[in-house]
Regions:
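GST-like domain detector, emphasizing the conserved glutathione-binding G-site
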Residues: 1-74, 92
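Amphipathic, well-packed alpha-helical segments that form the structural scaffold of globular domains
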Residues: 56, 60, 82-86, 110
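Amphipathic alpha-helical packing segments from all-alpha helical-bundle domains
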Residues: 71-88
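Catalytic and substrate-binding regions of cell-wall glycan-acting enzymes that process beta-1,4-linked
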Residues: 119-127
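Long hydrophobic alpha-helical segments typical of transmembrane helices together
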Residues: 127-154
Length: 154
């Protein structure tokens, strides 16, 4: 869970609020302008409120044994991945030709979903999501923030 401590003493402890604060300071790629705010927040809320709990059940299926892992995956696809895929089959990013705050907020969760069973994800009929995720994973931005830190001693 990221936490931002501002020089004023204010603490921002929600990922979306941190993103919004940072983009209000500087938005050189226009992520806030690239999407209608209501629609962007709809996708982010769908991710946070619906997809994330389903992702956790899929990712940590040994903790959620009331259904098999494939049932958790199917629920996540129906509720979130399939609608996202339909959208991304029409346009390279959620709201057109340019990335938006919603794209940057969602892709880490879709990345987690893909890596639970990478072979299955790569073979699934999800061309829109797969292409979109590949762009993010191949981006300089992703490479810059995913630098491996040395392990801390116990």
């Amino acid at each position: 869970m990221p936490v931002l401590h501002l020089p004023s003493g204010e603490v921002i402890d929600q990922s979306l609020a941190i993103m919004q604060w940072a983009l209000a300071q500087s938005d050189p790629q226009g992520w806030l302008r690239a999407s209608p705010a209501d629609e962007a927040m709809h996708w982010i809320a769908l991710n946070d409120d619906i997809f994330k709990p389903l992702l956790d059940r899929y990712k940590y299926a040994t903790r959620h044994t009331e259904q098999p892992q494939c049932a958790h995956r199917a629920a996540a696809i129906t509720a979130f991945i399939a609608p996202l895929n339909e959208r991304l089959l029409q346009t390279p990013y959620l709201f057109g030709p340019s990335p938006s705050v919603a794209d940057i907020a969602l892709f880490p969760f879709v990345h987690q979903f893909a890596w639970v069973d990478k072979a299955w994800f790569d073979a699934a009929p999800l061309a829109g999501v797969q292409a979109w995720l590949a762009v993010w994973l191949g981006s300089d931005l992703f490479g810059a923030v995913m630098v491996k830190s040395p392990a801390r001693p116990p």
